[in-house]
Amino acid sequence: MQPNDITFFQRFQDDILAGRKTITIRDESESHFKTGDVLRVGRFEDDGYFCTIEVTATSTVTLDTLTEKHAKQENMTLTELKKVIADIYPDQTQFYVIEFKCL
């Protein structure tokens, strides 16, 4: 069995598969992904594979520079997105946006 390249919380799986979630915002430990990378995607909770994505763009962002566009790409409100990011990455300010599409 091949290892997964990136994981998402299970609660995001349906939105990813339906194309409602088209970005992920990560910390520096996952800043190495590049446009064109093809990644196996698993669930964080059990590492179970559920799809393959292609990275379509990457950029940097801070909590203060998150926009409504980012929120829409995450299928959340901007307030929800800022809270989720702050909860997952407390005390961090610099983040990496990975835009993707399911293959």
From Swiss-Prot:
Belongs to the N(4)-acetylcytidine amidohydrolase family. GO terms for molecular function: hydrolase activity, acting on carbon-nitrogen (but not peptide) bonds, in linear amidines; N4-acetylcytidine amidohydrolase activity. This is N(4)-acetylcytidine amidohydrolase. NCBIfam families: PRK04980.1 (NF003443). The gene is yqfB. Catalyzes the hydrolysis of N(4)-acetylcytidine (ac4C). It catalyses: N(4)-acetylcytidine + H2O = cytidine + acetate + H(+); N(4)-acetyl-2'-deoxycytidine + H2O = 2'-deoxycytidine + acetate + H(+); N(4)-acetylcytosine + H2O = cytosine + acetate + H(+). The lineage of its organism: Bacteria, Pseudomonadati, Pseudomonadota, Gammaproteobacteria, Enterobacterales. GO terms for cellular component: cytosol. Keywords: Hydrolase.
